[in-house]
Design a protein with these regions (language model features):
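Extended redox/cofactor-interaction regions of prokaryotic respiratory oxidoreductases
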Residues: 103-171, 176-183, 206-210, 296-413, ...
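Acidic/polar loop patches that form or flank catalytic/metal-binding clefts of enzymes
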Residues: 118, 223-224, 260, 274-275, ...
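Glycine-rich phosphate/diphosphate-binding loops that line cofactor/substrate pockets in enzymes
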Residues: 66-88, 142-150, 240, 261-274, ...
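Long, contiguous, secondary-structure-rich segments that constitute the structural scaffold
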Residues: 448, 454-500, 573-586, 590-677
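Active-site phosphate/pyrophosphate-binding segments
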Residues: 212, 232-353
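N-terminal export/assembly segments and adjacent metallocofactor-ligating motifs
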Residues: 1-221, 256, 375, 637-677
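N-terminal leader/propeptide and maturation segments of large enzyme subunits in energy/redox metabolism
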Residues: 49-63, 79, 83, 219-257, ...
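Short beta-alpha connecting loops at secondary-structure transitions
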Residues: 192-200, 421-424, 436-448
Length: 677
């Protein structure tokens, strides 16, 4: 990203044409980053709540006063010797996407404090842990090599809106004669540009993968040599797949059997063949197993032998040997303490739990949560079952500190809101989950108002808490210099990174042509320790698994992000919200007609957990039996002050303890038909 600065103000944001994987392209949302930075709603000074929780009444205070009070209150909650420090919970995710402004000084602070640990599961942990269980790490093919593929299967990814740089390479391949197949319940912008679209039911991706395997076996489209030398556990999965003929897979997926046969034929007979997998498909009960089944497919046909063959879900695991996470986060500051772990995806339930409450697994909850420190996240908008999340954050006895750019739904319920810098105002280091380049993010302009980087806020708070370890004196540049291991140990030299702006990892062109996966044996683990052989798991909520529930709520709902939002980020940018208009629900014409719904009409979407209202859009983007509730809108910016997470639940995926956002049954009716009881 290249920022044009005039008189100390960022006036334009462009892509860097010299950056190899992106070639100067920016998506619409990031191209408006200057508008976001100078938004009239920026929080530029520390704020303290003076009214009731959620009243929106705050007063401006100085940094010293705010930090002193926060430190005093956290110290009081932690108790003598920090005995009750687990009652304090950090809550963060990927807001800055950076190594420094993410988990460096913040991690040091909470390790030293002995606070509860956070299981950061809200986005990708089901697929990520599934990939690690199969390949040994979150690793895959080079994104640049898709340009040379002859078949590209885009599975669970609206790449035009969420992975623009991959899409550029896919288009190059298409122009050279490659076939593109999109697998997605929704007829996305990407699906419209592919040669074929398989619109399966949400949560049935594992069944489709097993049906493809069945056809690979019976037609002998297998690379027996690659399977024998570079996989473990194939016989058991082979037996399982043979029980999934196309007819069974198709019936489960809600598609035609010929679609399964055709996909298997294309995949089994085309070289090089590549899969671009993304995280939408793993946000259901069986998402981890489905990701494992899909990740095994390239091994069965020997796709990894070609540099333009294989699979990419995430490349972030390639950086695992380059980053010195211990130097950044200092887990040694915990000493002998072993704090409990809170799953960020069940924060709605956990904020309402009492001390020692018996949990479903037979364990005890531990101390009631008394304080939350939120940074790089907006949980009131993005966490599942938001009715419970709001109820927890609204507790008057909960002390909440939020580091933010804006008064988000979460900030509205805080006791203190501390102004944080944006990407244009601080130093950071970035790695990628879509390519293999590390980048440096230099500050382009001085911080606005009294905004401080996350690192600076936690550094100052540590001083107020009396944490005198030398590591809390590290500057951001000090952190940047130790973030990566030396080049001789697989990392990067900071001076080189700063001089060039980016550095590429040294990874083989065809990394698994001869096996060499990151597992102990170097083989793809079809039978993975602790997980066994993957299988199809039906959704928590579906006609097959919960017929009585489905009779009341017959429509499956998925909630992918709006094209011009990054989950809840950018929702308050006026120009982008102007493009999106208002929250909508996409619904199939037949499903709409059966309910007396016409396009543009206000509808009510509901289940036992809650309800929302928005505008219906009737058309082909939704397949029969599925509605698409696009998000993630801030509740306060939606017409009914709610969003789709009012309807989602907190049950977790099979692998990775992740939320199953897309495993959700609802009913829809005209808003005018509802009469409050």
């Amino acid at each position: 990203m290249v920022v044009t600065v005039e008189d100390g103000r960022a006036v334009k944001v462009n892509g860097d044409p010299d950056h190899p994987p992106t070639h100067g392209a920016l998506c619409t949302k990031v191209s408006r980053y200057a508008e976001r930075t100078y938004h009239e709603g920026r929080v530029l000074h520390p704020l303290r709540r003076v009214g009731a929780k959620g009243s929106g009444r705050f007063e401006r205070v100085g940094w010293d006063e705010a930090l002193s009070d926060i430190a005093a209150r956290l110290t009081a909650i932690a108790g003598p010797g920090g005995a009750n420090a687990e009652a304090i919970v950090p809550y963060s995710y990927a807001g800055t996407m950076g190594l420094l402004q993410g988990e460096s000084m913040a991690a040091r602070f909470f390790n030293r404090l002995g606070a509860s640990r956070l299981d950061r599961t809200i986005c990708s942990s089901a697929g990520g842990e599934a990939l690690a269980a199969t390949y040994g790490a979150k690793i895959g093919m080079h994104v640049e090599h898709y340009a040379e593929s002859r078949l590209i299967v885009i599975w669970g990814s609206n790449s035009i809106t969420s992975n623009l740089h991959f899409w550029t390479y896919a288009q190059q391949a298409k122009r050279a004669g490659a076939k593109l197949i999109c697998i997605d319940p929704r007829r996305t912008e990407t699906a419209e540009k592919c040669h074929e679209h398989i619109a399966l039911l949400p949560g049935t991706d594992g069944a489709l993968a097993l049906g493809v395997m069945h056809e690979l076996i019976v037609n002998d489209w297998l690379d027996h040599d690659y399977i024998a030398r570079h996989t473990e556990g194939w016989p058991a999965l082979r037996e399982r797949a043979l029980a999934w003929p196309p007819e069974r897979a198709a019936a489960t997926c809600g598609i035609e059997a010929e679609a399964v046969r055709s996909l298997a034929r294309d995949y089994g007979t085309t070289r090089p063949a590549a899969i671009r997998l993304n995280y939408g498909m793993q946000r259901v009960r069986g998402g981890g197993n489905a990701a494992r089944l899909i990740a095994i497919l390239p091994c069965l046909v020997g796709a990894w032998r070609d540099r333009a063959g294989g699979l990419l879900l995430s490349s972030s695991g390639w950086f695992r040997t380059a980053i010195d996470a211990a130097a950044l986060q200092r887990p040694d500051l915990l000493g002998t303490r072993r704090p409990r772990t809170i799953n960020m995806s069940t924060i709605g339930d956990d904020l309402l739990r009492e001390t020692g409450e018996l949990l479903a697994d037979g364990s005890r909850f531990g101390p009631r949560i008394e304080a939350l420190v939120v940074y790089n996240s907006n949980p009131v908008a993005v966490a599942p079952q938001s009715g419970k999340v709001v109820g927890g954050f609204a507790r008057e006895d909960l002390f909440t500190v939020v580091l933010e750019h804006f008064m988000t739904d979460t900030a509205d319920l805080a006791d203190y809101v501390l102004p944080a810098t944006t990407q244009l105002e601080h130093l950071d280091l970035q790695i990628s989950y879509g390519h293999t380049y590390a980048l440096i993010n230099e500050a382009a302009v001085a911080p606005l108002g009294e905004a401080r980087p996350n690192t600076g806020i936690f550094r100052a708070l540590a001083a107020k808490m009396g944490f005198d370890e030398p590591c809390f004196g590290d500057s951001d540049e000090d952190l940047a210099r130790i973030a990566f291991k030396p080049a001789a140990r697989g990392g990067f030299d900071f001076a080189d990174l700063r001089a060039q702006g980016w550095r590429k990892l040294a990874i083989a062109d065809a990394p698994f042509a001869e096996g060499g996966f990151a597992t102990p044996s170097g083989k793809c683990l079809i039978d993975s320790p602790g997980l066994g052989v993957p299988d199809y798991l039906p959704n928590y909520e579906s006609a097959a698994s919960t017929p009585e529930l489905a009779a009341r709520f017959p429509l499956a709902m998925i909630s992918p992000p709006e094209r011009n939002f990054l989950n809840s980020t950018f929702v308050n940018v006026v120009s982008l919200r102007g493009i999106e208009g208002e929250p909508v629900l996409e619904i199939d014409a037949g499903d709409a007609a059966a309910r007396g719904i016409v396009s543009g009409q206000k509808v009510r979407i509901f289940n036992d957990r809650g309800e929302i209202e928005c505008k219906a859009v009737v058309g082909p983007r939704a397949r029969p039996g599925v509605v698409n509730g696009l998000g993630v809108w801030w509740r306060k910016l939606a017409p009914d002050r709610r969003n789709g997470n009012e309807l989602t639940h907190q049950r977790l995926t099979d692998i990775g303890r992740a939320p199953s956002f897309y495993d959700c049954l609802v009913e829809v009716e005209p808003a005018s038909a509802h009469r409050p009881r």
